[in-house]
C-alpha cells in the first residue's frame, strides 16, 4: 500500500494558531488524559496533541512510516515530556 507524504496543517486552537504534522481529525477537548499502552503511565495533553498521538498509533498499525516519523519528530519537539511517557519505547520495560 502506498501512502502520501504527510502535510503539515495549521489549526485554530481556542484562538491560537498551532501547527500539527499532518492532516488529522482534531479532538475539541482542551485537555485529555491518555495512558501509555504498555505500562499504563498517564499524562494530560491538549486534544490536538492526542489527535496526533492517535494518528501515529494508527499509522504504525498500517506501516505508514513517513507519518509515524513525522508525528514522533513533532512530539519530541512540542511535547517532549509526553513523548517520553507515551512514545519512547526505549524507556518501556515490558
Please identify what each model-predicted range represents.
Residues 92-94:
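Conserved small/polar residues in nucleotide/adenosyl-binding loops
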Residues 4-50:
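N-terminal acidic leader/helix
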Residues 86-88:
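Short coil/turn segments at secondary-structure boundaries
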